[in-house]
Amino acid sequence: GQHIDSLEWMSDETKAKAHEKLNNFYVKIGYPDKWRDYTGLTVNPKDSYYANIRRAAEFETLYSLKDEGKPVDKTKWYMSPQTVNAYYNPSSNEICFPAGILQPPFFNFDADDAVNYGAIGVVIGHEMTHGFDDQGRQFDKDGNLNDWWTSADAEQFTKRAEILASQYDNIVVLDTVHANGHFTLGENIADHGGLRIAYTCLLYTSPSPRDS
């Protein structure tokens, strides 16, 4: 929240909305309270890889179609617990960290604080920042596509986002091939935000982090 408050270019009105959204994050950690039923999915080692993948894709599609016309289930996970990844879902304003990523090298109970903040801390901050990047900022605290920014603040955000995109545009990948800063803008914003959040948390944890 203090990073929001430190934005000199953002109005108090938009800051208040940003705080509302941040405070309304739905956090999922480890594994869901209820598990998916996979009894309808047949995985046959005697079949071809294609046949198994096709059945899995059909099973997943039918599973998704069952939600049509029903109220949104906020307890539903869109990633399995064993997946080494994390996500932010703007349409439900949720952040999810499966059990798979809560282990080395991302999190180690015996590691130094700096190691964990530099690993899982950055990941957590990255996903949180997605709620306020060029895509996530278009959704409100309830996950609705709703413009909660003042026009002046939106203009200031776009101006700064363009600077970041241009910075990445100048990265040479190979010979004359450059990175596309606009294509990766959301991830770049989230990376920068994740680093700032993790480092700020480390400062509060360690009495003298600069000396360690």
Predicted regions mapped to residue ranges:
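Intrinsically disordered, low-complexity linker/terminal regions across diverse proteins
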Residues: G1-S206, S212
